[in-house]
Amino acid sequence: MAEIKKGSLVRVVREKLENSLEAKASDNRFPAYIFESQGEIVDTRGDYAFIKFGKVPTPNIWLRLDQLEKFE
């Protein structure tokens, strides 16, 4: 797998996000755009990345790096 780092374009892997601790801790009805469109990693801290989805005004989100994959 290619390295995911600051500036990488990514998408969220649905199977890895659903039923995760993050999904259980908040509303688990995630918007489709996080799975279908590209987001840019703005920052990383430990095992987490801060992701910005830029086509429409949406809130940025912290997710685990293992829940992301390079956007192709």
Curated annotation (Swiss-Prot):
Transmembrane segments: none annotated. It is an enzyme of class 7 (translocase). Keywords: Membrane, NAD, NADP, Plastoquinone, Quinone, Thylakoid, Translocase, Transport. It catalyses: a plastoquinone + NADH + (n+1) H(+)(in) = a plastoquinol + NAD(+) + n H(+)(out); a plastoquinone + NADPH + (n+1) H(+)(in) = a plastoquinol + NADP(+) + n H(+)(out). Pfam families: NdhO (PF11910). HAMAP family: NDH1_NDH1O. NDH-1 shuttles electrons from an unknown electron donor, via FMN and iron-sulfur (Fe-S) centers, to quinones in the respiratory and/or the photosynthetic chain. The immediate electron acceptor for the enzyme in this species is believed to be plastoquinone. Couples the redox reaction to proton translocation, and thus conserves the redox energy in a proton gradient. Cyanobacterial NDH-1 also plays a role in inorganic carbon-concentration. This is NAD(P)H-quinone oxidoreductase subunit O. It comes from Trichodesmium erythraeum (strain IMS101).
